[in-house]
Amino acid sequence: MNLSRIGFYTLTDDRARNATSTSQMMRGELILSSRCNFKCPYCRSVGGPDIDIEKAKEIINLWADEGLKNIRFSGGEPTLYSGLNELVELARLRGVERVALSTNGSASEEQYQSLIDSGVDDFSISLDACCAEDGDKMAGGRKGAFGVVAENIRWLSAVSYVTVGVVLTVANAGKTEQIIKFADSLGVSDIRVIPAAQEGQTLPTISVSDELINKYPILAYRENNFRTGRKVRGGPTRRCAIVLDDMAAMGDNHYPCIIYMREGGQPIGKIGTGMRQERQRWHETHDCTQDMICAGNCLEVCVDYNTKHESFNQRN
């Protein structure tokens, strides 16, 4: 399997072949705030205060010193963080190639345009419904939320790279096909369908045309895994290679990945110049198959990446 064909642009064969604790840092994800104006039923709040902007700048600069290629700002809802534009501009100034934002899609068009002007070129937005009644419920009962989100997805898709995440729960799983078709009508770049962590590990049968599924690499990858009986989560490799050149940060701490952090896992260590070495030691000593968080939540695409990294190392 060529990782580049899956659709997650930060996960490639070249990266798996070359990843070490001293290679270019390929990706960083920074939690800016736990605040959110939605109350999605499946969301696991990260808690804690907004990150101090000077601490956020410190993290970005430390990552940039390691040649950071891709950064993602998330939360909570990162558009509620007052210093977001300043951090985006700093990332661009330091040479970061791709700047991504995980957002619920509720901000104003003016704010999203200002973020594009500052340097954001990747938007990840949740789309868990295909109609206003269901969409407002999935946002925690916020009336009118779905219409705002849908229109923002539509116009952002015309000017930027936009993926939508369809989180399936018992409330919306029966409308998976309608949601996919609606997302397609908005002009998105890709569609990430995934069951909520609380709802189990399998996807429902996706009864849309092969032509539509194959239009979206990530959707096609997930649908093929479902047809072959593969779960979205679980079954990790013994060693995690993603930690070598990838980092999730919240406050003063760095974590193996964003999922590990959201599931309540312990940080690898404190933010500082020795982070890459700490992550190397974690990679060498941590058995992911014996870690309940990894064993139950590692995404299949991460398993494929780690498997590819192992195969390259065995050849060497």
Which residues fall in each region the model found?
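Radical SAM enzyme [4Fe-4S]-AdoMet core and its adjacent flexible, acidic
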Residues: 51, 117-122, 126-272, 276, ...
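Hydrophobic residues within beta-strands of alpha/beta enzymes
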Residues: 43, 71, 99, 123, ...
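Conserved Radical SAM active-site core
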Residues: 48-102, 106-121
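Conserved beta-strand segments that form the floor/walls of ligand-binding pockets within enzyme
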Residues: 31, 72, 163
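N-terminal pre-core extensions flanking Radical SAM catalytic domains
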Residues: 1-49, 61-64, 214-217, 233-234, ...
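Generic structural signal for well-ordered alpha-helices
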Residues: 28, 60, 88, 112, ...
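Conserved functional loop/turn residues at catalytic and ligand-binding sites
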Residues: 35, 39, 44, 67, ...
